[in-house]
Every structure is written in structure tokens, then in C-alpha cells.
């Protein structure tokens, strides 16, 4: 699997209402990944508008900051 980029979780934006993290995609949309998917070990965020994917770099303890939001 090839990734457009590898992004640190700290650089992503958390939407507490939807429970997702986003990051701007070059196509103009946003890469998205659900917090629950990250908890399950998923690390690939996809863009719904194009075929690009990014790898989210994080440690499991990094997720705790979003649960407190």
C-alpha cells in the first residue's frame, strides 16, 4: 500500500461531534479517520473524493487526549 504522506496525529483536526480526525487533502477535500478506527489499530486515513491515503502516526496513549474533548 502506498501513502500520499505520513502525518502525525497532532497535526490533524478532531471533530468531537462526529468522532473523526481530518487533515487537508491536495484535492480540496479532507482525509478522514474515525477515532474508533484508530482505537482498533487502523492507521490509514482516506479521502472520500480521491484515491489518496495517508498513514496516521500515533501512539495508543495519544488517543486519550481526544476522548477528554
From Swiss-Prot:
Any one of the GO BP annotations: protein histidyl modification to diphthamide
Binding site for Fe cation: 25, 27, 47, 50
PROSITE patterns in UniProt: DPH_MB
Reaction catalyzed: [3Fe-4S](1+)-[protein] + Fe(2+)-[Dph3] = [3Fe-4S](0)-[protein] + Fe(3+)-[Dph3]; 2 [3Fe-4S](0)-[protein] + 2 Fe(2+)-[Dph3] + NADH = 2 [4Fe-4S](1+)-[protein] + 2 [Dph3] + NAD(+) + H(+)
Cysteines paired by S-S bonds: none
This protein's GO CC annotations: cytoplasm; nucleus
Domain-related comment: The DPH-type metal-binding (MB) domain can also bind zinc. However, iron is the physiological binding partner as zinc binding impairs the protein electron donor function.
Protein name: Diphthamide biosynthesis protein 3
Organism this protein belongs to: Yarrowia lipolytica (strain CLIB 122 / E 150) (Yeast)
Gene this chain is encoded by: DPH3
Amino acid at each position: 500500500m502506498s501513502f500520499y504522506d505520513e502525518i502525525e496525529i497532532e497535526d490533524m483536526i478532531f471533530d468531537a461531534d462526529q468522532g473523526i480526525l481530518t487533515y487537508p487533502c491536495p484535492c480540496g477535500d479532507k482525509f478522514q479517520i474515525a477515532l474508533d478506527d484508530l482505537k482498533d489499530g487502523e492507521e490509514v486515513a482516506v479521502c472520500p473524493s480521491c484515491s489518496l491515503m495517508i498513514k496516521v502516526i500515533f501512539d495508543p496513549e495519544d488517543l486519550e487526549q481526544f476522548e477528554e474533548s
